[in-house]
Amino acid sequence: MDKYTAVKRTFEENQDQENAVKMAKYMRDLFVFYGIPTPKRKKLYRDFLKGEGKNKTIDWGFLDRCYDDEHREFQYLVADYLSALN
């Protein structure tokens, strides 16, 4: 399973529809959300980012796929990924 699919599956398994509606409304329905609060979201991919940080190479293909996903959590992941590799 590729990185994008693994992260997507993790987000889908931890989604909260009630929070997703609230988050979308807060952002004036400009984005679709899984409804995962920031602390939980960051915890879900903490180990993944640690592993990526050891590579010392940015996987731009992975980041492009994440950023193109309609769910806002993926765009947050891109920012956190780049910060972790900085």
Question: In which residue ranges do the predicted regions lie?
Answer:
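Surface-facing alpha-helical segments and adjacent helix-coil boundary elements at the starts of domains
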Residues: 1-86
